[in-house]
Structure formats: C-alpha cells, structure tokens
C-alpha cells in the first residue's frame, strides 16, 4: 500500500552514511493507480510520490540551497522485489526505484544507482523511504531514474543476517536491481539509457559502489558504467581499515567490529565456533540479540565498550590480521581496490573521518593509477568528520553525474538538456585557478561553497581559487540554469 506522502522530518545535515536469470522473465502485467506491477518474482509496489513543488520543499528540508539544486520533475517511488544469487541459493530481496514523472517517457533517462550506508534496522532501508531513502527523490528530481538496493538481510529480507561489507553480495544486489529495471515493464512506462549508468554510495555504500562498479565492468557488458563516485568507503580493509582501527585504543563505533565478524561468519562459516572466541563476556552473549534487525546502531554502540581492550579478547587483534587466518582471508576477499576502472571514478574523502580512514581512498588511487587507470582521482573534501563529509560527497557525486549526463527536458521528446553542451570546468580538481566558460563568453556566474554560501561572482572565464580552502564548490550560471561542481585541491 502507498505510504503517507507528508514531508518526512529531515535533520539539517546528512547523517552517517552494506538463481534464476532475470532475463528469463517472459511475462509481466502493468497495473495503474495503487496497483502492483508483477514480473514473475519481481514486483513494483508504489510507496510514495512527490510533485515538483514537494521535491523542492524536500531539498529545503535537507538544507540544499536553490542556487545549487534546482529539480526539473516530480518523482514517483516504488519498492522493487527481485531475485539475486546469494551463497548457494536464489533469494528474494528488495530495493527502491525512483522515477521522474514530468519527462517524456520515450526519452531514455540516465540511471543513477546509489548504494546506502551502514544501517542495522531492516526498515531503515531505502525502500521504506528512510532518511537515506529520501535522497532518491532529490536525485531523481534532476531527471535521473534512481535505484537503491536494500541489500541482503535488510528491507523486506528477514531471512538473513545482513552480510555487512561483503563485496560479492553488495555488488549482486546492485547488478540484479539494474537488470530488473531493464528487463521488466516499467511501472510508469519510462525508457532508460543503458549507456548512462552512474554509480555512487557513501560509507558502507562507498565500499558497495566500488564493488558494484567492478562487478558491472567485469561481468555485465550490457550495463557499462558511465562514471562512479564512491565516498568514504573501506576499500582497503586489509591494508588500511582494520590496521588503523586496531592500532587505536578505542574505535568510534564498536558495533561495526561485531557487525563485520558476525556477518562474515554467516557467509564464510569458518571464523569462529562461538562469538566469545573473538569478544569478551558479557558482550559476546548479547550480540545475537543486539543484531536482530530491529535494534538501531546507537543502541548497539551504547551496549558495547568503546575501548577495544575491553571488548575484544586479549591477543585476538594480532591473530585476526595474520595471513592465512580465516578473518584475514575474509578481509582480503572483501578488499575492493585492486582492479583497474575503465570509466571515470572519483573517490571523495575527508581527512578527519573517524569511522572510515581516508587512507583507503589514497591507497586505492595509488594502486589503480600505478597499474594503468587513466581516469581515477581521490578527492579531498576537507577536514570534516564522517558525518559532515557525507553531504558534500553524496551531493557532489550527484551534481558531477548531472554535469555529464544527457537529461531529458520536461515533457519533451526532442529537446535534450543543455548539460551535453556545457563547457566543462578545467582543471578540475583545481588549485590556483579554474576556467569555467570559453574565453569569448561573458555569462554571469556565482561561485558557492558546499553550504550554498556565495564566495565570488563575475563574468570572467577564469576564477581565481588560490585563496579558497580545499573542498567542493559549485559555479552557478543563473541565466542558463546550470550548476557545475568544482573541486579545490591542495
């Protein structure tokens, strides 16, 4: 049934942000109104709708200034249930689909698939229109069809413990949701461009986005990635994330340590016989009840000690990182940086991130570029913690995609968005200056930081940036209705 479409209560900053072949589907039934679209094991259930004014109001609730974000369409949301392989079975999982409502349905939309961050409660998944799920309305409001997988063990799947930071299942949940979109009759009759698939995610979603990009490039040639932008993800679990975590006397989220161990045990089956082999009592005996899919992360963290020596069994940390140990083998299996992207890839990070250490992005960038990647960048968004970094990374990726994509104008089959004719700022990232328009042009522009504060204005073709702090900025061309992301790096 449809949810109440009253505005969700949105905090003022982004929060901390883990068979059968679907091509064999032969029949589908399209129903209208509050009905459900069925395609064998797939269903598309209406879960919400926002017209253009409501999307604009939602952007204001998220603190997105109109100078940086101007949607062009209303959006309808659907919960998708679809099949994917997991371990030795085919399982039914869920995800969210956000479709533009005011664009010509025969004009193919670009597709943005967003991989969500760490959650513990199943109903916090995107298809329940949770806080992070609300981002789908904003992303789709720019003219994209947006997909958000819930992942295994979350959303409608109550048969599994969520396999946290498990690259294979993260990637499969995204790839099979994309496949469901392209192989099923669309609930609104919209068309989609398989050559414009953009991938992003933040935190665990950054890890999942990297895994999905790798999976699509390697095994799904029919769905080439146009660009991807993972944010603050643990790409190098063996080389960065766990060594940095274990080197400190405390960790900001002890729930993550337990989540990882329990999840990997559920997948690999050889890490331990009992959680008490890794964790001290009384905590070890409490973990099954805490990770029940209904207990929020803050409550789990409050139940566990932040000092690692009070939580993890003595000597276990050294053992976990020993080559050949089951935990170390599982860690290596879930590293997602040792491959060579063929499409442009940006990794956004912040240097004060206390949850996912920024060296993950630097190690991934170094490996990829040293081994032949030509369009990979690690982008420093500044000295922000994990929560404050999220908005810049998620919004920056969204507008970076928007600057590259061909987006349909509202209700037009012939006219395309001007974004395919935009002068792309260069160099970008910039240090001392950035050129934002051709030398002969004299369009008025304003430069804004990620909070929407105006920093400069003018008509010159170059902007001096040497006095600006590192981070994400946007140049706004009011007359053309364009907002282009610029990264200042040092």
Language-model segment annotations:
Residues 2, 13-15, 37-40, 416-490:
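C-terminal outer-membrane/trafficking sorting elements
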Residues 41-104:
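Catalytic-loop region of hydrolases
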Residues 87-90, 101-138:
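Short, surface-exposed "cap/lid" segments of acyl-processing enzymes
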Residues 164-187:
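Alpha/beta-hydrolase active-site loop
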Residues 212, 343-345, 357-367:
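Short alpha-helix in the alpha/beta-hydrolase fold that links the catalytic acid
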Residues 231-338:
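Accessory cap/linker subdomain of secreted extracellular hydrolases
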Residues 323, 328-329, 355, 362-363, ...:
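C-terminal catalytic histidine-bearing segment of alpha/beta-hydrolase fold enzymes
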Residues 346-353:
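Short beta-strand/loop motif that positions the catalytic acidic residue
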């Amino acid at each position: 049934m449809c949810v109440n479409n009253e505005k969700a209560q949105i905090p003022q900053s982004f929060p901390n942000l883990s068979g059968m072949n679907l091509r064999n589907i032969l029949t589908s039934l399209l129903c209208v109104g509050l009905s459900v679209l069925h395609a064998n094991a797939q269903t598309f259930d209406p879960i919400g709708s926002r017209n253009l004014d409501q999307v604009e109001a939602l952007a204001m609730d998220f603190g997105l200034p109109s100078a940086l974000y101007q949607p062009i369409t209303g959006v309808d949301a659907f919960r998708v249930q679809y099949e994917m392989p997991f371990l030795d079975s085919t399982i039914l999982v869920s995800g969210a689909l956000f479709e533009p409502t005011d664009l010509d349905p025969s004009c193919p939309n670009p597709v943005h698939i967003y991989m969500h961050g760490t959650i513990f409660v199943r109903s916090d998944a995107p298809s329940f229109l949770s806080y992070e799920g609300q981002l789908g309305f904003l992303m789709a409001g720019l003219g994209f069809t947006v997909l958000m997988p819930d992942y295994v063990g979350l959303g409608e799947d109550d048969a599994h413990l969520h396999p946290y930071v498990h690259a294979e299942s993260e990637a499969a949940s995204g790839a099979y949701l994309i496949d469901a979109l392209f192989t099923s009759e669309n609930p609104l009759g919209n068309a989609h461009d398989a050559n414009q698939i953009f991938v992003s995610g933040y935190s665990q979603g950054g890890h999942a986005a990297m895994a999905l990009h790798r999976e699509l490039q390697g095994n799904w040639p029919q769905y080439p990635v146009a660009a991807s932008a993972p944010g603050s993800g643990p790409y190098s679990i063996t080389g960065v994330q766990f060594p940095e975590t274990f080197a400190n006397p405390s960790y900001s989220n002890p729930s993550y340590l337990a989540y990882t161990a329990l999840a990997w045990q559920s997948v690999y089956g050889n890490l331990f016989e009992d959680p008490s082999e890794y964790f001290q009592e009384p905590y070890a005996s409490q973990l099954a009840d805490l990770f029940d899919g209904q207990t929020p992360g803050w409550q789990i963290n409050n139940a566990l000690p932040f000092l690692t020596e009070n939580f993890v069994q003595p000597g276990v940390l050294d053992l976990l990182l020993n080559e050949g140990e089951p935990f170390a083998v599982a860690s290596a299996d879930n590293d997602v940086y040792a491959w060579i992207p063929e499409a442009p890839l940006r990794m956004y990070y912040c240097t004060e991130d206390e949850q996912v250490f920024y060296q993950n992005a630097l190690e991934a960038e170094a490996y990829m570029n040293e081994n032949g990647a030509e369009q990979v960048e690690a982008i420093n968004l500044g000295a922000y913690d994990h929560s404050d970094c999220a908005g810049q990374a998620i919004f920056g990726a969204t507008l970076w995609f928007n600057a590259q994509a061909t987006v349909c104008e509202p209700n037009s089959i012939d006219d395309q968005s001007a974004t395919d004719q935009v002068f792309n700022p260069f160099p970008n990232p910039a240090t001392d200056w950035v050129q934002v328009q051709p030398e002969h042009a004299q369009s008025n522009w304003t430069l804004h930081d990620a909070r929407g504060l105006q920093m400069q204005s003018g008509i010159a073709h170059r902007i001096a940036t040497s006095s600006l702090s590192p981070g994400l900025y946007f140049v706004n061309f009011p007359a053309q209705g364009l907002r282009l992301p610029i990264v200042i790096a040092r």
